Amino acid sequence: GDFGDMVKESIKPILEKQGYKVTLTEFSDYVTPNQALAEGAIDVNVFQHKPYLDSFKAEHKLDLTEAFQVPTAPLGLYPGKLASLDAVKDGATVSAPNDPSNFARALVMLNELGWIKLKADVDPLKASKADIAENPKNIKIVEMEAANLPRSRQDVDFAVVNGNYAISSGMKLTEALYQEPSYAYVNWGALRTADVKSKWAQDVIGAYKSDEFKKYALERFKGYKYPAEWNIPAAGASGSSAASAPVAASQASASK
């Protein structure tokens, strides 16, 4: 996946120049990478956003720490039958992922756009249709399996699509008319808390924060949501701090 490619194509060469041996291990689930990290089978993992890590380590009593952000394929609003945000019309149809966490992200995005208005006290992680206070454009939100969103674009006016499914279906992230502006769900690299201040860990963090990696990532992963400290706005985004909710694009972890 993309996080594995970042290691192979940029991070590994940077660290090897400093004398490290880097071994990449790829996982196909969201549980093993944190357990392997906690147990010492790997030294770093890169696959998850902070809310997922926070809940996982609390549930499993693991002493892990998020150490650096990585470019992440974001949730985006893509054209369907209509090609621009200005073309939105009364009764427009918008498809969105049907799982609760990603549906909440979609609602937050539509709220950001001003197409709907959510209740003032809504928890953005848990927003549902019941939290829509106003719908001045009579937007019809069509819920469907996240994996089916890309190919159903021709059936709706706009589609809210997860970055990983957009990429796997051949869509370009740069086609998005709007990306969620929140940095709450950019993915992080995680370390064992006891290791964070060690020389090797600081060198790994330094590699991900280096100008060399930034230059590579901006060229190789166009349209991604980049680390907040890079200060690069998302497509059509205003940089809101409203939270959104989980999607992990792919799994990869690097060990020294």
Where are these regions (language model features)?
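A bilobed periplasmic-binding-protein/Venus flytrap-type ligand-binding module shared by bacterial periplasmic
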Residues: 74-85, 185-200
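Ligand-binding "clamshell"
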Residues: 55-67, 82, 155, 160, ...
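Short helix-initiation/N-cap motifs at beta->coil->alpha
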Residues: 24-35, 122-151
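Alpha-to-beta junction loops
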Residues: 38-48, 92, 115, 137-140, ...
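Pocket-flanking alpha-helical
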Residues: 30-61, 77, 83, 168-170
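Periplasmic-binding protein-like
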Residues: 104-111, 208-229
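A conserved helix-loop-strand patch within extracytoplasmic ligand-binding domains
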Residues: 67-117, 214
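Short, polar/charged alpha-helical segment
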Residues: 1-23
